[in-house]
Amino acid sequence: MMEVGILPVHVLYVFFIGAIILFMLLRKDTTFISLFGIFIISLWASHSLSASVSSLFHSFIYAAGELLPTIFIICFIVSMSDLLTKTGINEAMISPFASLVRGPVTAYWLIGGLMFAISLFFWPSPGVALIGAVLLPAAARAGLTPLAAAMAMNLFGHGFALSGDFVIQAAPKLTADAAGIPVGDVVSASIPLVLIMGVTTTTAAFIMIQRERKKQEHPTSFSPVLSGEQDNSLYLPKRLRSILAFLIPLAFLADIACMLLFNLQGNDATALIGGSAICILFTVHFFVYKHKGLEKITGYFIDGFKFGFKVFGPVIPIAAFFYLGDSGYESILGTSLPKGSHGIVNDLGIALSHMMPMSKELAATALTAAGAITGLDGSGFSGISLAGSIAKLFSSALHADPAILTALGQISAIWVGGGTLVPWALIPAAAICKVDPFELARKNFIPVAIGLLVTTLAAVMML
């Protein structure tokens, strides 16, 4: 039985969700409409202009506070990865695999597998440069086409690994917060869906590549583009590089073992990975700079913070709007929820279940579509909170597990916008393989569409 009716504040919230979706479809920046929505809803709820103006600042403080652990871990991972690249340790980690590239088939799966592993721990951006420098020349000699190499890097890194984000947990944090559920629930629910999506898509892409390769009498050869002259001035001695290249992955594997052993999830897991990254950064840093180490470390942190806030700058305003629909209402607006309300999104979900027949099929399709729409800006992250919010709405109406729908929306958003279908998100992989990003997006479309269809059907069966 409904405890609270649909009030003007609910109508305003739905209106601005629609406006945000429209802005995304038109590929417009969502920051203005998100903040304008917070202002108008606050003005209606508080009847105070000064409180409404203050709510804009409070919304940033609230959203940043919720996201700060995630932002920081991205900063520290990027700082560490930058130093590992400059010292040659990253190259030492994967150079042994170059000798395993025997033909185009092994090249595709080896590039994909390594890109997946690197992206889980360091995110895809460092992986593109690293594999471009070490593995792509070997793949080219083995007969892998430029487009196939770009597809492997893209689908395994920016799609398969990033859509689950099991180690860093930036994506699950955003969607879980918007859905009002623990991060661990989203991670657990996403594991089978991420595997289904990843295996289906990469296999479909491989089949397409093999068919096209058989049609080509003379496969295209290529030399990967590297970003300028390689600077070896900070390279550590070969023996030390090899030792650290062995110990650093071991440290992160130990972190994963601790997560499983002590059931660490959410911020606890984030803290363990982030702390390990800081320790590795300090250790390698003192090997490189020795007595000058204290003078150099700040620069790496600054570069990491620049990257982290560049990625999450567009995320904070839209996340603030969706926090308003759940746990952040009172903190942001400084006023209580309407009597009997369980949060704007919960109320809307209950109302939706009374207004129209709801089905698992409709809910899963809606979440896949919502996720895809949020990815149209090419980041995969800026609108991902929308998927979590809609998942909560539909799960309330269905009385179903919100984690499954949340995971489905997350997967759809990141596969589309994180860098497999939106051309401007494909530029790094396309550039290093010397292919057109629009052609890469076109080749990715069929495998990703097949994957999303199969994953949506799987989610329906899991609900």
Curated annotation (Swiss-Prot):
Question: Where in the cell?
Answer: Cell membrane
What Gene Ontology cellular component terms go with this record? plasma membrane
Q: Which UniProt keywords apply?
A: Cell membrane, Membrane, Transmembrane, Transmembrane helix
Q: How does it sit in the membrane?
A: Multi-pass membrane protein
Q: Which residues cross the membrane?
A: 6-26, 31-51, 60-80, 101-123, 130-152, 189-209, 242-262, 269-289, 304-324, 413-433, 443-463
Task: Tell me what this protein is called.
Answer: Uncharacterized membrane protein YhfA
Per the UniProt record, the source organism is Bacillus subtilis (strain 168)
Per the record, the gene is yhfA
